[in-house]
Structures are given as C-alpha cells and as structure tokens.
Amino acid sequence: MSKVTPQPKIGFVSLGCPKNLVDSERILTELRTEGYDVVPSYDDADMVIVNTCGFIDSAVQESLEAIGEALNENGKVIVTGCLGAKEDQIREVHPKVLEITGPHSYEQVLEHVHHYVPKPKHNPFLSLVPEQGVKLTPRHYAYLKISEGCNHRCTFCIIPSMRGDLVSRPIGEVLSEAKRLVDAGVKEILVISQDTSAYGVDVKHRTGFHNGKPVKTSMVSLCEQLSKLGIWTRLHYVYPYPHVDDVIPLMAEGKILPYLDIPLQHASPRILKLMKRPGSVDRQLARIKQWREICPELTLRSTFIVGFPGETEEDFQMLLDFLKEARLDRVGCFKYSPVEGADANALPDQVPEEVKEERWNRFMQLQQQISAERLQEKVGREILVIIDEVDEEGAIGRSMADAPEIDGAVYLNGETNVKPGDILRVKVEHADEYDLWGSRV
C-alpha cells in the first residue's frame, strides 16, 4: 500500500487595501492549484507569506509588526506586497526574512515557495480549486481588479514608485473573470484599481474581444458589459476625468449601481496644485449638480486630506465650504502623514500635529451632520438591501449606497429567515449618522 505524502502547508497574512486582497487571492489560487494546503495558523505552516501594505506610516508599522509576529511564531517567512518594494527598510528591522518581493510579483513569490517548500506531487483533479479561484471575501461579493499601477504623480502618494505606471488588463480577460464570479454565486462585483477611470488609457482604448465580439478597452464599455451580468456593479477609485460623466446615465438606467467613489482630496485650488490634483472646485460642484440631476439616486463617496503641508486656515475653510455645498453622502478623512519617498515631504510649512487633529475633528463633525441629514431623507422610503450577515437577532445588510467595510449598514432586527447574498426590499424606519434600520416589505 503506497504511503500518502502530506500536503505542504502555507500560512498567509494579507494586509492593506482591496487591491492587495486581490493579489493575495491570486497567489493563494496558484498555491492551491499546485497542491499546497493553506492553513489558518502559524503552528501548522511549513512557511508563512506576508502580503504587506506600505502606503502610509501606520500601514508600514502594521506590516512590520505582522512580519515580526510571523517570524516569532513560525520562523520561515516570505514578504511580498507594497512594503516589499522597500527591501532595505524590512531587512533593517527583520534581517531573518527569507525572501522579499515587491507588489504583483506572483511568479517570484511562487518560485521562492518552491525553493523552500518544494512543490508537492499531487493529482490536480483533487485540488478542488473553484473555477473563480480562491476568494477571501464572502461568497456573495468579490473585487474585480481591472488594472495595475497609476500614471498620476500626486505628491502625497508613492504608489507609482511601488506598483509602476498604469497597465490595464485585457478587457476580455476581465469580463471572463466577472462571468466566472457570477457563475459561482457572486451577487455584487466591486471594480477596483489604482485609477479605474483611466482603464484602457495605456493601450489607447484598443478593441479587445469577449465571446468573439469586439469590446473597447474603456471604463464605459466595461460598465456596459458588466451590466449584462444581472448583478450589482460598484465602481471604486474613480479619478474625476471628463468621461466619468458618461457612466452617470448607465447608473440612471439601473445598469450599474448609482454609486461613485471619487477621491477629491481637497477643495482649495492652491492645495490641490501642491498635491498635483485637478484644481477647479467650481467645475467639480457643477458636475456633481449635473450628475444628481441625471441620476437623483446617486451616492457620492470621497476621501480628503487635512493638514497637508502649506494648508492655511483659509484653505481649510474652503474645504468646509465645499462639504456644505457638495453634501456628499459618504466621506473619509485622513490627517496628512509623511510617507517615505513622497514629494510632499519636501514642501515647506508643515502643519503642526495639534492643528491637523483640530481640523480633522471640525471636518468630521460637519460631515457627520451632513451624513445624518442625507440618511434622514431615506426614512419612510423603500430601498434594496443585500444581506451580509444573519444571526438569531436578525440580519445586517447594505443598501446600494453602501460598499462593504467602508460605508454604513442596514439593520433588520428579527429578520432571521434570510441568508447572505439575498437581496430584499426594505422600508427604512430609522437613521443615524451612518446606518439605517428597517423592515422587509
């Protein structure tokens, strides 16, 4: 009787943004396909891979701590991801790391794994890797990464130095992946990249093919094709190019979710110029007004930075005035933090930490009030809700206005006879600053 060789076991730690999560999913899919077992504890693992984030100082610290924990608990560690682009910084703290690779270096990661934990002999038909690959999200939603890198050179950001210039995935490949996800039961696709609206710019929007039919490599064409899958499609990280106007009618027609995640960063033309971001606030306000006229249900999410070098009280007041006028639905705000390698570090007039904190608090207080007023407008209305969690007390879901992890929730107390992924019609009965409560219609 032949002896069964145990599968080699790999531990995996995934940190950072959804784009990093997709990279982790790809590496895990390859490992599973090759016969490796992915385990949830350090003790059982023959080796640990840590996929890091290096965007801001707190993320760097979290990544370094995760690497240290993996080394202490296991000892055999490979590091990849954004912080991997700064090998010297990692080696200085953790010299015992076996190998370090930068972001989206899938092949290199696998080569290193093969070197330290040789590839097992296995029957590929027994790997049981789902056709859509290994996913780290719940079964009913998934991230669809359409490109890598970014052509912008925002002074606060080091993503281009870590992930390079924009490289768009072939549109046929993207649409085939979307179809596999839907076939596997996914009800909501979240389109992500460093710059979603630039999709196809690097290939001059060339024509690709899907199911034998020509399709233009562009954000608008992609949205039109995804709308045919009959699921929720949500756009993230949309830079405010003029052609963003072209997706608003698709939202109004119900083809994709009326949700736009568009990081604006500031509202002072002077600060936007220092950031190397588009600077016409009046034009942006006019566009927002026009978008809402075309699609009244539109939810606008954005992120801003307070305390950027050189920001005066007058600049900050412009930002508050913009919030009052734009009345955005979902807003995130960060206190400026120097990132190693970012051009903004060299700018004069750095803002004191206590001023950053005070401005952040004023910003959040104002936006909290706006958010509460926007949500109060939904009380008494009927909305669609996708269910995320169910327990003995009821269900928690999200409306079309809520992306997972970053936005609000809809609470359905006593609604236990549903399952994650169900989409219900709900009457909104109560709202606070961020969340809604309601009952199934």
Curated annotation (Swiss-Prot):
<dbReference type="Pfam" id="PF04055">
    <property type="entry name" value="Radical_SAM"/>
</dbReference>
<dbReference type="Pfam" id="PF00919">
    <property type="entry name" value="UPF0004"/>
</dbReference>
<feature type="binding site">
    <location>
        <position position="53"/>
    </location>
    <ligand>
        <name>[4Fe-4S] cluster 1</name>
    </ligand>
</feature>
<protein>
    <recommendedName>
        <fullName>Ribosomal protein uS12 methylthiotransferase RimO</fullName>
        <ecNumber>2.8.4.4</ecNumber>
    </recommendedName>
</protein>
<dbReference type="InterPro" id="IPR007197">
    <property type="entry name" value="rSAM"/>
</dbReference>
<feature type="binding site">
    <location>
        <position position="17"/>
    </location>
    <ligand>
        <name>[4Fe-4S] cluster 1</name>
    </ligand>
</feature>
<feature type="binding site">
    <location>
        <position position="82"/>
    </location>
    <ligand>
        <name>[4Fe-4S] cluster 1</name>
    </ligand>
</feature>
<feature type="domain" description="Radical SAM core">
    <location>
        <begin position="136"/>
        <end position="373"/>
    </location>
</feature>
<dbReference type="GO" id="GO:0046872">
    <property type="term" value="F:metal ion binding"/>
</dbReference>
<keyword id="KW-0408">Iron</keyword>
<comment type="similarity">
    <text>Belongs to the methylthiotransferase family. RimO subfamily.</text>
</comment>
<dbReference type="GO" id="GO:0006400">
    <property type="term" value="P:tRNA modification"/>
</dbReference>
<dbReference type="InterPro" id="IPR038135">
    <property type="entry name" value="Methylthiotransferase_N_sf"/>
</dbReference>
<dbReference type="InterPro" id="IPR012340">
    <property type="entry name" value="NA-bd_OB-fold"/>
</dbReference>
<feature type="binding site">
    <location>
        <position position="157"/>
    </location>
    <ligand>
        <name>[4Fe-4S] cluster 2</name>
    </ligand>
</feature>
<dbReference type="InterPro" id="IPR006638">
    <property type="entry name" value="Elp3/MiaA/NifB-like_rSAM"/>
</dbReference>
<feature type="domain" description="TRAM">
    <location>
        <begin position="376"/>
        <end position="441"/>
    </location>
</feature>
<dbReference type="InterPro" id="IPR005839">
    <property type="entry name" value="Methylthiotransferase"/>
</dbReference>
<dbReference type="InterPro" id="IPR005840">
    <property type="entry name" value="Ribosomal_uS12_MeSTrfase_RimO"/>
</dbReference>
<dbReference type="InterPro" id="IPR013848">
    <property type="entry name" value="Methylthiotransferase_N"/>
</dbReference>
<keyword id="KW-0949">S-adenosyl-L-methionine</keyword>
<keyword id="KW-0479">Metal-binding</keyword>
<dbReference type="InterPro" id="IPR002792">
    <property type="entry name" value="TRAM_dom"/>
</dbReference>
<keyword id="KW-0411">Iron-sulfur</keyword>
<keyword id="KW-0963">Cytoplasm</keyword>
<keyword id="KW-0808">Transferase</keyword>
<dbReference type="GO" id="GO:0103039">
    <property type="term" value="F:protein methylthiotransferase activity"/>
</dbReference>
<dbReference type="InterPro" id="IPR020612">
    <property type="entry name" value="Methylthiotransferase_CS"/>
</dbReference>
<feature type="binding site">
    <location>
        <position position="154"/>
    </location>
    <ligand>
        <name>[4Fe-4S] cluster 2</name>
    </ligand>
</feature>
<dbReference type="GO" id="GO:0035599">
    <property type="term" value="F:aspartic acid methylthiotransferase activity"/>
</dbReference>
<dbReference type="InterPro" id="IPR023404">
    <property type="entry name" value="rSAM_horseshoe"/>
</dbReference>
<dbReference type="GO" id="GO:0005829">
    <property type="term" value="C:cytosol"/>
</dbReference>
<feature type="binding site">
    <location>
        <position position="150"/>
    </location>
    <ligand>
        <name>[4Fe-4S] cluster 2</name>
    </ligand>
</feature>
<dbReference type="GO" id="GO:0051539">
    <property type="term" value="F:4 iron, 4 sulfur cluster binding"/>
</dbReference>
<comment type="function">
    <text>Catalyzes the methylthiolation of an aspartic acid residue of ribosomal protein uS12.</text>
</comment>
<feature type="domain" description="MTTase N-terminal">
    <location>
        <begin position="8"/>
        <end position="118"/>
    </location>
</feature>
<keyword id="KW-0004">4Fe-4S</keyword>
<dbReference type="Pfam" id="PF18693">
    <property type="entry name" value="TRAM_2"/>
</dbReference>
